[in-house]
Amino acid sequence: MQKATYYDNSGLFGGYTYPKPDSYNYGPAHQSYPTSNIDSDYQGSVCPIQTAAVRPPALKDSDLNGDCMRQSSSQNNNNNQATSISEQQAPPLSASSPSSNSSASQKKKSPSSSASSSATPALTKQIFPWMKETRQNSKQKNSNNCATAGSDHDGGEVSDEKSPPGPASKRVKTAYTSAQLVELEKEFHFNRYLCRPRRVEMANLLNLTERQIKIWFQNRRMKYKKDQKSKGLAHSPLGHSPDRSPPLSGPNHIGYSGQLQNVNSLSYDAPSPPSFAKPQQNMYGLAAYTAPLGGCIPQQKRYPGSEYEHHGMQSNGSFANANLQSSPVYVGGNFVDSMPASGPMFNLGHLPHPSSTSVDYSCAAQIPGNHHHGPCDPHPTYTDLTSHQASQGRIQEAPKLTHL
């Protein structure tokens, strides 16, 4: 068995001869052992690790075989551990030069059990304390640290609130008392944004933290904005609002504005008669009927040779006549209208004008000199109106018409 064990390991001892079991003669006593044989021939053995560095001059055959037997038996049990140790220890041992016999004998006498026992703690030392921590525990610790830091330094302000320790800790909702809410609402009524000195003062007054007051004001401002938006949508007009209608320029003036200016390009500044009992209602309703005048463009008629466009106001009754097609006509350059409930015709030409240039008609100069209104035959002629005005005794000379 000793021979078989030695012959199995004879590849490691290539330079030695083995003549007889009872003789102790070896070939060359000292021979440099190449390191390539360690790596290529047999890497898993512990014997070349201990014998390659120093070659002893003479050893007993029984000691040598006994060491190899014990190491080969331990190698079968701890093959993986010995391989890892040999790979770790081979470079420094192979690079070292031959030393004294005492160090070699100490290496020889160390049993394989000590080598195997040293291999186990070497592997156990690789497990560090940080490897024992699981990811879940580290996440919980990090979340607790972040929550604490966030509660301490939120918005650049320091507060004494800290999240309670625990894996699933949640911030407790602050319950404000009625007295605190009243004071906060009062402060919000005067100032929607608090400065820091005032916030510190209120925190001391209400026994709250600055952070709580700051968050309450943020939430209250958002609520205020939502309320304003809801109110704005509720009160938004669907049609023309009263303030959008053109206002009257004065109690004695009528202005065609807005849509009529875009269509007709006319501006009338005719003063209303002071003899009206209800001047606001008898000003022909021009301010109130601005939108209907713009909407009844298909009913309009056109004077030949002029840009004046009149509208048949059948719905409002301001310009209605017996033939339902009446419209304002020109009487010597004056603006004449027929009232729905009154028989006499009101001629605005008899009223005193501030100046003859205050009444501007852009289309009057284009009307022919005979004052004949082409398609407007149903209306009374110029002579009829002048005779009707003569019966009233309020005839005045018509102002001279000029271009704008």
UniProtKB/Swiss-Prot annotation:
Which residue intervals are annotated with compositional bias (Low complexity) in the record? 71-122
The signal peptide stretch is: none
Q: List the SUPFAM superfamilies.
A: Homeodomain-like
Question: Polar residues composition bias: which ranges?
Answer: 32-43, 137-148, 383-394
Q: Where in the cell is it found?
A: Nucleus
Instruction: Please name the PROSITE patterns in this protein's record.
Output: ANTENNAPEDIA, HOMEOBOX_1, HOMEOBOX_2
One GO term in the molecular function aspect is: DNA-binding transcription factor activity, RNA polymerase II-specific
A GO cellular component annotated for this chain's UniProt record is: nucleus
Keyword Nucleus part of the UniProt annotation: yes
Region spans: Disordered: 1-122, 134-173, 227-256, 372-404
Record carries keyword 4Fe-4S: no
Query: Where DNA binds (residue ranges)?
Result: 169-228
Q: Which UniProt keywords apply?
A: Developmental protein, DNA-binding, Homeobox, Nucleus, Transcription, Transcription regulation
Its biological purpose is as follows: Sequence-specific transcription factor which is part of a developmental regulatory system that provides cells with specific positional identities on the anterior-posterior axis.
Annotated PANTHER family: HOMEOBOX PROTEIN HOX-D3, PROTEIN ZERKNUELLT 1-RELATED
Provide the protein name.
Answer: Homeobox protein Hox-D3
Species: Haplochromis burtoni
